[in-house]
Amino acid sequence: MGIKKYKPTTNGRRNMTASDFSEITKTKPEKSLLDSQSHTAGRNSYGHITVRHRGGGHKQQYRLVDFKRIKDEVPATVKAIEYDPNRTANIALLVYADGVKSYILAPKGLEVGMQVQSGAEADIKVGNALPLTNIPVGTVIHNIELKPGKGGQLARSAGTSAQLLGKEGKYAIVRLSSGEVRLVLLTSRATIGTVGNEQHELINSGKAGRTRWQGKRPTVRGSVMNPNDHPHGGGEGKAPIGHPSPMSPWGKKTLGKKTRNKKARSNKLIVRGRRPGKH
C-alpha cells in the first residue's frame, strides 16, 4: 500500500501523509461480523483514570477478527481486503467452503481470490495457519499464540513478523521483531507471512486534530504543570525538576526503571531480551 502526500495548502496539510488505500477492495464492512463498542476514555468502573491520554475520537464499530483460526481442513476464499479502524493492519474477509464468513489479519501478499486454510495439514503459504510443530525452521510468521487455543497475541501490528529459529523439546524458539527471542509451545498456532500495510509507520498526522480523531488526547510535560499535579511542576519560569532522577506523576523514579515483574513466570521462556546485552 502506498503513501499519499498532500500539498501544503494549509498549515494542517503541510507534511501530512496518508495511506492511498490502494489495497482496499471493499469499503462497507460485513454486517454479521460487526459489534458495538463503548469508549471509556481511559476510566475504570469507578470513573478513575487508569490510562492517560485517551478520550474523544470518532465513533467506531468493532470488527470480529478471528485470531484463533481453528476451522481446520476447510478451505476459504479471500473475498475482500478491508480497512479496520481498530488496528493498524488491514483485514481480509474470508468465505469458507461451507458458507461461513470470517475476518483475519491481512498478511502481505494476500489478494482477493486466493485460498487459505488452517490445520496441521495446511500448506506453507501466506495466510495459512498451522501449529508451530508443523512449520519449517526459518519461516516468517505472525499472529502467534502464547497459549494454545487462546488466539494469536504476538506480531499482529502492521508490518510486523517473527521468525521461527528452531525447535527444542516441546518449545519453539521464536525471534520477535523487537529482537526478543523467546520460547513458545509447539502446539501453539501461527500464521505464515508478514502482517500487511507495512507503510503505516511512515504516516504523518500533520495536525493535532487528526490525532484527536483517533481518540488520543495531548501528552503534557510534567515540568509545565503545577507542583500539586506533578513532581516536576512548580518553580519560577523554566525551573529544573528538583529531583535527582525524573519522576512519574505518582512520585516514582522513572528513568530506566524496570516495570516488569522480576518474578514473572514467563521470564524463564525469554531466551534473550529485546534490549542488546540485557536478559
Curated annotation (Swiss-Prot):
The cross-references to InterPro entries, in alphabetical order and at most eight, read: NA-bd_OB-fold, Rib_uL2_dom2, Ribosomal_uL2, Ribosomal_uL2_bac/org-type, Ribosomal_uL2_C, Ribosomal_uL2_CS, Ribosomal_uL2_dom3, Ribosomal_uL2_RNA-bd_dom
Q: Which GO terms describe its molecular function?
A: rRNA binding; structural constituent of ribosome; transferase activity
- Give any Pfam family that matches: Ribosomal_L2_C
Residues forming coiled coils: none
Biological process (GO) annotations held by this record are: cytoplasmic translation
For this record, an example GO cellular component is: large ribosomal subunit
**Where do the record's region annotations for Disordered lie?**
1-43, 207-279
Read off the SUPFAM superfamilies from this record: Nucleic acid-binding proteins, Translation proteins SH3-like domain
Keyword annotations: Ribonucleoprotein, Ribosomal protein, RNA-binding, rRNA-binding
Spans of biased composition, class Basic residues?
Answer: 209-219, 254-279
Composition bias, Polar residues: 8-22, 34-43
Q: Which NCBIfam families match?
A: rplB_bact
Q: How does it assemble?
A: Part of the 50S ribosomal subunit. Forms a bridge to the 30S subunit in the 70S ribosome.
Q: Tell me which PANTHER family the record gives.
A: LARGE RIBOSOMAL SUBUNIT PROTEIN UL2M, RIBOSOMAL PROTEIN L2
Hey, which family's this protein in? Answer: Belongs to the universal ribosomal protein uL2 family.
Function, as annotated, reads: One of the primary rRNA binding proteins. Required for association of the 30S and 50S subunits to form the 70S ribosome, for tRNA binding and peptide bond formation. It has been suggested to have peptidyltransferase activity; this is somewhat controversial. Makes several contacts with the 16S rRNA in the 70S ribosome.
Record-given protein name: Large ribosomal subunit protein uL2
Q: Which gene encodes it?
A: rplB
